[in-house]
């Protein structure tokens, strides 16, 4: 009886000790693993792979509590990453490269598009089969608009006389309306975003010139980190990229399923057909090299893009490649 009582007392003391310790452990883990991925723009179909990872619990399975949040432009998000006010961003690698060249302490840790899905569209009665067809056309140009910034190299590569293109400067918010009302002949778009939306509004099938098929390969979607956060939380970054890659794999295997998963999280509902097309354009452009993790980066891709950015004046100084990207967090 006395021995049994002593065993109960010892066991009880152990339970008290465990109960005193246990509550602090999950609290610490939760605080360390709660992260926000800040998109550089409003929610759209090209973000679907990340919402697949969220919807299927892949982030949770890695011990992460992830919030996927809208942004208000790449420059704003990159500055927040650099200051430490945001930890992870998702947006164009080209924008990250410009930020690094300006001295911001950020880095691309996964590259999901080696060829940004950009295109130029026209109405059916406006011929547009090759870059040469841009000559004699009215093209909408806006400040900070990627294709407009790269028009010079694109024309040079394809032997197009840029002076024969009528470039009409306008506010970015007016571009679509100007195109739909035929004030301009051709409009640059992201095939994974505006193209299906504008085509749905117009009710016609546009002619599409895919710029990557004509030599202009710009790095696209990527995961970007603030350097300090990545250095201090390497395991968190690795877990996030591992779960995101699973979301990408599932989206590639089932684009329509990915669109349905994305639809659950949209504050403003999108037409299902438009969302399907946005996701499809995203997955076909995904960087999934054989034998490498999804998001793996090659030096040659970065060198070519940095040279192009230097040529166009988008960056003034080239830094070592290691300043722009790393594969260290990919598994």
Over which residues does each language-model region extend?
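N-terminal export leaders
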Residues: 1-10
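C-terminal segment of classical bacterial N-terminal signal peptides
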Residues: 16-27
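Short, glycine-/small- and polar/acidic-enriched structural segments
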Residues: 29-181, 185-192, 209-211, 217
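Short, solvent-exposed mixed-charge patches
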Residues: 30, 231, 330-331
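Pocket-lining segment of extracytoplasmic ligand-binding domains
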Residues: 94, 174-178, 182-268
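Short, surface-exposed acidic
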Residues: 162-166, 268-279, 315-323
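Secondary-structure end/capping motifs
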Residues: 231-312
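Conserved C-terminal helix/tail region of periplasmic/extracytoplasmic solute-binding proteins
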Residues: 302-331
């Amino acid at each position: 009886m006395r021995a049994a009582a002593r065993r109960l007392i010892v066991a009880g003391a152990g339970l008290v000790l465990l109960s005193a310790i246990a509550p602090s452990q999950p609290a610490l883990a939760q605080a360390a693993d709660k992260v926000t991925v800040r998109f550089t723009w409003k929610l759209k179909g090209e973000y679907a792979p990340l919402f697949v990872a969220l919807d299927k619990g892949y982030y949770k399975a890695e011990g992460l509590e992830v919030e996927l949040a809208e942004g208000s432009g790449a420059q704003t998000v990159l500055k927040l990453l650099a200051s430490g006010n945001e930890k992870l961003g998702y947006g164009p690698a080209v924008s990250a490269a410009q930020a690094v060249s300006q001295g911001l302490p950020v880095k691309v840790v996964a590259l999901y598009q080696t060829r940004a899905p950009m295109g130029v569209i026209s109405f059916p009665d406006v011929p547009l089969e090759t870059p040469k067809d841009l000559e004699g056309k009215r093209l909408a140009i806006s400040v900070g608009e990627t294709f407009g910034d790269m028009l010079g190299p694109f024309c040079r590569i394809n032997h197009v006389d840029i002076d024969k293109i009528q470039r009409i400067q306008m506010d970015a918010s007016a571009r679509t309306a100007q195109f739909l009302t035929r004030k301009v002949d051709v409009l640059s778009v992201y095939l994974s975003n505006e193209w299906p939306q504008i085509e749905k509004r117009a009710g016609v099938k546009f002619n599409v010139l895919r710029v990557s098929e004509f030599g202009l390969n710009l790095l696209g979607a990527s995961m970007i980190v603030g350097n300090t956060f990545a250095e201090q939380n390497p395991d968190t970054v690795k877990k996030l990229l591992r779960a995101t890659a699973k979301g990408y794999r599932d989206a590639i295997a089932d684009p329509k399923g990915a669109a349905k998963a994305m639809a659950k999280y949209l504050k403003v509902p999108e037409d299902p057909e438009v969302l399907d097309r946005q996701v499809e354009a995203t997955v076909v452009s995904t960087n999934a090299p054989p034998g490498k993790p999804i998001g793996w980066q090659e030096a040659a891709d970065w060198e070519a893009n940095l040279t192009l950015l230097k040529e166009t004046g988008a960056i003034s100084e080239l830094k070592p490649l290691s300043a722009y990207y790393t594969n260290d967090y990919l598994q």
